[in-house]
Structures are given as structure tokens and as C-alpha cells.
């Protein structure tokens, strides 16, 4: 009975969620687009000409938002966007116009090579401007296990950013408050000159999710 009440409550909240309604009206696949939108408007992350990698992209709302921003550039002509968006996820994703999607686990060598090849082609052999990560683990409810899973995904995003970002680039990751949160923030501070925490209004009040933004890579000795 308790589970049914929970499901009914979630469904009621979801149906009446203004961000869900807005996403349906504006053609976004998920309300998560407005989390990125709010952070982008505050921090000016997405700019014309950028090469952007979206980790954990499915169902694709962050890629949609990034693509739309690049399409708004005065230099976007002949149906092409001004820049590039490369998305990757373990799960399948319906195509997004102008977005290159790779389905697979980028921890696997063959998938990682494909990702690197696509990124190099998109950037003209240069490094990338922005890494987005909305990756989230399946939470077990066991605090210590969940903290380890969350930290692991953040570590993957940090490692990818360290290897592929331009010095002036940025990394935005989803995280959750918990026992490992402070360690993740410290890792960001070791890797980036500027670190900020963001809790957009589109994040549900009941959710412990937050976003960590790192900008300007520190020089690795």
C-alpha cells in the first residue's frame, strides 16, 4: 500500500510539474533541460563555435538544449549549427538533429576510441570546450554503496575532462549530497581553478541532486 501511495504521489507531482509541462510545450524530452538552461544562463557555459560532449546523454534533453544554443548563432547557416555536440550513453537515444550519438560504455576501449575519433573530427584535432555529465547510478538505498557509485561516475567525468578539455574549458556534473560529496568537491578544486555548486530551481525540492561546475583546468605537474 505504501509503495502504491508513493507511486501515486510521484505521478501526481510529475503531471502537475510546471517544468514537465514546459518541456512538453517546447519539445524537450525531459524536464532536465531546464536545469542546464538555468545553469547556462547564470554561468554562460554554451557559446557559438564550441565543441561539447554530453556524457550520460539519454534521453537527450541536455543535447537538445546545447544544440539549440549553437543553432541560435548568427554564424549557423544552411541548416548547420555553429559548433558540435557529441553525446554518449549506455542506453539508446532517439536521434537529435545535428547531434552525433554513440551508444556504448566509454570505459570500453573500442567505444572510447570511437568517441575520441568523433570528438577529434568535430574539433578539427583540437581539444573540447565543455563536458556535460548528467550520469547517475542506480541507487540502492545503502548510503555507503550509493556514495561510492556517485563518486565513481564523477571520477570518470573528471578523468575525461582532464584529458580532453581546453585549458579554458569547463565541466558540469550531476552529483548528490551524501557521505562522498565533500571528497568530490575537493577533487574538482584540485583539477580546476574555479569551482561552483549549483542547485537550479528545476531540481525537485525533495531531490538531493546538485551540480558541480569546474572551469579553467589547473596545470598538471
Curated annotation (Swiss-Prot):
InterPro entries: RNA_methyltr_RlmE, RNA_MeTrfase_FtsJ_dom, rRNA-MeTfrase_E, SAM-dependent_MTases_sf
Binding site for S-adenosyl-L-methionine: 60, 62, 89, 105, 134
GO cellular component: cytoplasm
Positions of the catalytic residues: 174
Broad class of enzyme this protein falls into: transferase
Matching Gene3D superfamilies: Vaccinia Virus protein VP39 (3.40.50.150)
Superkingdom field: Bacteria
Protein task: Specifically methylates the uridine in position 2552 of 23S rRNA at the 2'-O position of the ribose in the fully assembled 50S ribosomal subunit.
Annotated protein name in UniProt: Ribosomal RNA large subunit methyltransferase E
Organism: Cupriavidus taiwanensis (strain DSM 17343 / BCRC 17206 / CCUG 44338 / CIP 107171 / LMG 19424 / R1) (Ralstonia taiwanensis (strain LMG 19424))
Gene that encodes it: rlmE
Amino acid at each position: 500500500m505504501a509503495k502504491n501511495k508513493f507511486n501515486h504521489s510521484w505521478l501526481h507531482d510529475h503531471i502537475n510539474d510546471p517544468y514537465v509541462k514546459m518541456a512538453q510545450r517546447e519539445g524537450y524530452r525531459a524536464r532536465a533541460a531546464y536545469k542546464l538552461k538555468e545553469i547556462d544562463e547564470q554561468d554562460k557555459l554554451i557559446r557559438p563555435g564550441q565543441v561539447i560532449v554530453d556524457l550520460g546523454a539519454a534521453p537527450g534533453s541536455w543535447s537538445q538544449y546545447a544544440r539549440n544554443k549553437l543553432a541560435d548563432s548568427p554564424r549557423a547557416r544552411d541548416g548547420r549549427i555553429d559548433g558540435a555536440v557529441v553525446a554518449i550513453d549506455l542506453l539508446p537515444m532517439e536521434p537529435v538533429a545535428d547531434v552525433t550519438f554513440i551508444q556504448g560504455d566509454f570505459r570500453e576501449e573500442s567505444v572510447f576510441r570511437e568517441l575520441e575519433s568523433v570528438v577529434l573530427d568535430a574539433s578539427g584535432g583540437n581539444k573540447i570546450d565543455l563536458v556535460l555529465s548528467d550520469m547517475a547510478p542506480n541507487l540502492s538505498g545503502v548510503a555507503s554503496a550509493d556514495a561510492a557509485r556517485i563518486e565513481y561516475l564523477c571520477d570518470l567525468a573528471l578523468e575525461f575532462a582532464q584529458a580532453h578539455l581546453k585549458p579554458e574549458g569547463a565541466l558540469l556534473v550531476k552529483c548528490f549530497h551524501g557521505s562522498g560529496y565533500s571528497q568530490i568537491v575537493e577533487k574538482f578544486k584540485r583539477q580546476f581553478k574555479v569551482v561552483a555548486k549549483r542547485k537550479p530551481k528545476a531540481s525537485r525540492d525533495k531531490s538531493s541532486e546538485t551540480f558541480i561546475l569546474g572551469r579553467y583546468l589547473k596545470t598538471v605537474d
